[in-house]
Amino acid sequence: CNFPETVKCLPENKAVLTGTPIRQELLSGDAREGLKFCGFNAAKPVILVIGGSLGSVAVNHAVRSILPELLKDFQVIHLCGKDKLDASLNGTEGYVQFEYIKDELPDLFAAADLIISRAGANAICEISALAKPNILIPLSANASRGDQILNARSFERQGYSKVLEEESVNAQTLQSAIREVYENRQTYINAMKKSGHTDSIGRILSLIQECERK
């Protein structure tokens, strides 16, 4: 299972918390290549914003509204979604925006010091496996079946993530969350590394081998 809440819903000794297997190429990213791809350097930490394939109007607006302040201390990679590019920001030092990234994504993950993301199960498990401090902004209950909210709250309870409800996302709340998570980043990193999510495939294989021996 992926969440401890799921284990509690199943018969005793019938479920094991393993985390979700992730794409192995994500674990082989090169931070230097990620910085080079974006035209960044190692002088400032990097925030990676992932708004999903369609992007999030609320998240995009909040990020861009605090960009001048963010760029004093951070560099920002913004995956803003299809048709969500802001041409007026092209050429802004320390900021790059893309509708979507595929092949270079492992390198961008490796370069990131903090990630802002939606809370789909696959996305958050990838973030956890990489032990990247993160802020999760789940789809609202009005725009989804509510699963992202449950995912995000579970990760928050386990100490892996900071959660902002989409309805509360604005310049002030986002900037405050970024400062809080970055200042306490090692606490989040330690919690994720202890979770075992960094080697979900290995844990699942071990369970299968154990069952074969019985």
Where are these regions (language model features)?
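Donor-nucleotide binding loops and adjacent catalytic segments primarily
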Residues: 31-33, 40-114, 149-151, 157, ...
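Active-site-proximal region of nucleotide-activated glycan assembly enzymes
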Residues: 1-32
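Short loop/helix-cap segments at secondary-structure boundaries that form the rim of catalytic
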Residues: 5-15, 85-94, 127
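C-terminal alpha-helical cap of glycosyltransferases
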Residues: 197-214
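Acidic donor-binding loop of glycosyltransferase active sites
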Residues: 98, 110-125, 132-133
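A short, well-ordered alpha-helix in the C-terminal region of glycosyltransferases
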Residues: 186-198
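Short hydrophobic beta-strand element within catalytic cores of glycosyltransferases
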Residues: 117, 133-145
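Short acidic/histidine- and often glycine-rich active-site loop of Leloir-type glycosyltransferases
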Residues: 126-129, 145-158
